[in-house]
Amino acid sequence: MPGSYFSFATMPATFTLGKLERLKRRKVIDQLFSEGKAFTVFPVRVQYLFSALPDAVPLQAGFTASGRNFKKAVDRNRIKRLMREAYRLQKNPLQEQLLQKQKQLGLFFIYTGRELPDYTLVNEKIAVILKRLTRVVNESSAKNT
């Protein structure tokens, strides 16, 4: 449109999932799976670990779907995209909690179901997971003080 101006600076930066917020380093992922804790809110399993992350962000997350349950890469990619979107829109309370407590948390979401989910199911499950993780952050900070 002529005369209109759009800038990324005007967009809220809180609902982003940038490169630094993604869990990518093999060493950190291996540590997460060897030393971390886990719980399941079917059909999503979450592996998490409070640790010093390599980047200066309070929260890093990774996402995966089983190649055993979903043979087509299109299906696996869709599931990961749905989980990333639900996480991106709901991570803010947990992120602010971690900033207040000055902690860093690594997360890995694993889709364990056998059927292709819809967005509402994934959104509900990610919401439950993030609320539970917020409680875990509060409990861990209460133990340390």
Describe the residue ranges of each PLM region.
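Positively charged, solvent-exposed patches that mediate nucleic-acid binding
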Residues: 1-145
